[in-house]
């Protein structure tokens, strides 16, 4: 997708600097005479792709620091989103833990969200449900499995493993009330940073109201968070007994999504988790 077409559409003139680090969008820092912007471009999608991101950022913005969003649109080649450029700085992982704990203190009557959104490039289903495990299996795991079936990344053997996994999960979890809490939804280390004042900044969410253990599970899946982050979170807002044992349940969701986005290179991790839980 041609960036000059997008800049013309935005009526922006400035120095264009590619920004590396993400797997989903083309990203740029646009330095104009008066300020800097962050521009995200994604080919072959409609602007609804970025409308979902803006909606998620607005949901988070009352409770944690997120970038402001200025304009989104689409061309014949794809869609774009113009955002605030926040200069990265250094910060304390304990402050990040406090910000996440504050986010997780926000609750809702039901699990889900008011509309579907995206995890990476994949549609994230968000129907409202009263029961957490009904929501999680249907709108998280099984929606990803359906996508994997469509691309021949799911077979009879994996389905059999999954059904046994599901049975073990439902037998192992205690029938206690789980409170729907506001989740970032894609909490890997690339989606949080610190600004120049040391404040945590949250980006690229896949927002819903769910079990907060899901955010913790993602934070521990691919690394990048120092031990003091989790220690501080536990001090501020302790997790329920047995939370460590349940993390693989939620990590399966993200591994399935990676299987769908990036292919069979994640298949062995999916298989191992299904077999070992």
Curated annotation (Swiss-Prot):
Q: Which reaction does it catalyse?
A: N(6)-(D-ribulosyl)-L-lysine + ATP = N(6)-(3-O-phospho-D-ribulosyl)-L-lysine + ADP + H(+); N-(D-ribulosyl)-cadaverine + ATP = N-(3-O-phospho-D-ribulosyl)-cadaverine + ADP + H(+); N(6)-(D-erythrulosyl)-L-lysine + ATP = N(6)-(3-O-phospho-D-erythrulosyl)-L-lysine + ADP + H(+); N-(D-erythrulosyl)-cadaverine + ATP = N-(3-O-phospho-D-erythrulosyl)-cadaverine + ADP + H(+)
One Pfam family named in its UniProt record: Fructosamin_kin
InterPro entries attached to this UniProt entry: Fructo-/Ketosamine-3-kinase (IPR016477), Kinase-like_dom_sf (IPR011009)
Q: Which domain of life is it from?
A: Bacteria
The UniProt annotation places ATP binding at 84-86
Q: What SUPFAM superfamilies does the record point to?
A: Protein kinase-like (PK-like) (SSF56112)
Query: Gene3D superfamilies from the xrefs?
Result: 3.90.1200.10, Phosphorylase Kinase, domain 1 (3.30.200.20)
A GO molecular function term, named singly, is: ATP binding
Free-text function comment from the UniProt entry:
Ketoamine kinase that phosphorylates ketoamines, such as erythruloselysine, erythrulosecadaverine, ribuloselysine and ribulosecadaverine, on the third carbon of the sugar moiety to generate ketoamine 3-phosphate. Has higher activity on free lysine (erythruloselysine and ribuloselysine), than on ribuloselysine and erythruloselysine residues on glycated proteins.
Q: Which family does it belong to?
A: Belongs to the fructosamine kinase family.
State the protein's name.
Probable ketoamine kinase HMPREF0351_12196
Native organism is: Enterococcus faecium (strain ATCC BAA-472 / TX0016 / DO)
Starting at the broadest rank, the lineage of the source organism is: Bacteria, Bacillati, Bacillota, Bacilli, Lactobacillales
């Amino acid at each position: 997708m041609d960036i000059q077409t997008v800049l013309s559409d935005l009526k922006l003139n400035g120095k264009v600097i590619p920004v590396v680090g993400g797997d989903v969008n083309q990203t740029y820092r646009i330095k104009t005479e008066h300020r800097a912007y962050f521009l995200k471009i994604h080919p072959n999608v409609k602007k609804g792709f970025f409308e979902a991101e803006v909606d998620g950022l607005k949901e988070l913005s009352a409770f944690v620091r997120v970038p402001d969003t200025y304009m989104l649109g689409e061309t014949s080649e794809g869609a774009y989103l113009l955002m605030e450029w926040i200069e990265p700085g250094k910060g304390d992982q304990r402050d990040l833990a406090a910000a996440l704990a504050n986010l997780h203190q926000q609750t809702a009557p039901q699990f889900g969200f008011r509309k579907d959104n995206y995890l990476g490039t994949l549609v994230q289903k968000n129907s409202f449900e009263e029961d957490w495990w009904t929501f999680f299996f249907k709108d998280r795991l099984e929606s990803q499995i359906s996508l994997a079936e469509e691309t021949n990344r799911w077979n009879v053997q994996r389905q059999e493993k999954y059904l046994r996994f599901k049975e073990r999960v439902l037998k192992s979890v205690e029938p206690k009330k789980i409170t729907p809490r506001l989740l970032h939804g894609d909490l890997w280390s690339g989606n949080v940073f610190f600004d120049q004042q040391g404040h945590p900044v949250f980006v690229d969410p896949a927002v819903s109201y769910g079990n907060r253990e899901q955010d913790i599970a993602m934070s521990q899946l691919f690394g990048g968070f120092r031990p003091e982050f989790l220690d501080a979170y536990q001090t501020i807002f302790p997790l329920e007994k047995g939370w460590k044992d349940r993390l693989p349940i939620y990590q399966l969701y993200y591994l399935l999504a990676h299987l769908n986005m990036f292919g069979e290179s994640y298949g062995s991790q999916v298989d191992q988790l299904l077999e070992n839980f």
